[in-house]
Amino acid sequence: MSLEGKVYDYLNKAVETGRENGMQFVVFHKDKCIVNANVGYTDFSKTEKITEDHIFPIFSTTKGICATLVHIMAERGKLDYNQKVSHYWPGFKANVTVGQILGMTAGLYREQSDLIASDFLDWNYMASRMCELTPLETPGVNFTYHTMTFGWLAGNLACLASGKDFQTLLEEEIKQPLGLKNLYVGAPKEVAEKVVNIVDEPYINDGDFIVDQERDIKKGWCRGPFYQWMNTNLGRMSIAPAASGVSSAMDIAKHYASFVGYKKPLISKNQLIKALEDNRFSTQWGYRGYGYQFSFMDNDKSLDKVRFGHNGYNGSFGFCDTKNELSFAFNKNYKSDKTINGEILNEFYKML
């Protein structure tokens, strides 16, 4: 059986046994797509099959895309990881560096409690609110996950450095060079309406989320289940580069494949080393550098044997394996405690 056939067999079994409902799993080796598996259905009615062009909510997988934009600006000399944010951002009050924003050690992880979800449609307003944040911890000391604020903080730094709005920057620096057609942060309404919904089991309960743009977003987290926000056009049209991205797995995989041979590298190997080496914090998700999560292959802590990228709520992920020159992306639509997202990469490596 071919490698792709083995993957399809594994994914189909996950659907047949009720562990998953609909998935995309894409793998590139250097510049060649070696697995393009689209399995299952868009919802529990099982009437519409998942295809390569279906677009899914990718939640925090968006953070890796946002980080790449910052690294592009840094490589061009327009941002310095060690420079104060206020050097680039007029009116920014917190005494933190660009690197502390990227590494989530800035202590700016909590949005003001008076924000409402419709505010996320207005980039300039959200950027102005980031200016007012005060660190809740001593900057540079502890890693604390910046669930939502990361996107506006890091994203606006890239915008200020380039002189362009976020969506133009994404289009010109990532989508056009790589030929991506299904990646959006702040999707147009006609795209938002077609995004695959996240479906769940009745007993899954992350809280009492009310899909209402007049509800407050408090304590650094949208009141759950978090996915319900991204089951609305309001969520999908939000320009929130920490969590509101929508994409096909193919486009996410191409982004990471650019680091190992697909078309033109978005950043150089030297810049990638800076992104992973200059700021290394060990977290519950492995190591974290400037905007990327990463882990070492074979317990060899050298940066030519690293797997980096970002995962997202509900199991979406995009990663690059520099040792084996592989890139991966995974999308899924079933919110379940039986998910395969924690094991699919290990299973794939066994198939090689």
Model feature map: region roles:
Residues 2-56, 78-83:
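Short, conserved catalytic-motif segment at the N-terminal edge
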Residues 8-12, 31, 54-82, 154-159, ...:
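Active-site SXXK
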Residues 21-23, 34, 165, 314-317:
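Short loop/turn microsegments at loop-to-beta-strand junctions
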Residues 32, 95-302:
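Short, surface-exposed loop or secondary-structure junction motifs
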Residues 34-37, 319, 325-334:
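Short, well-ordered beta-strand elements
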Residues 81-94, 177:
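Short, glycine/proline-biased beta-turn/loop segments that scaffold the active-site neighborhood
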Residues 261, 271, 276-280, 337-352:
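Short, gly/Ser/Thr-rich active-site loops of penicillin-recognizing serine hydrolases
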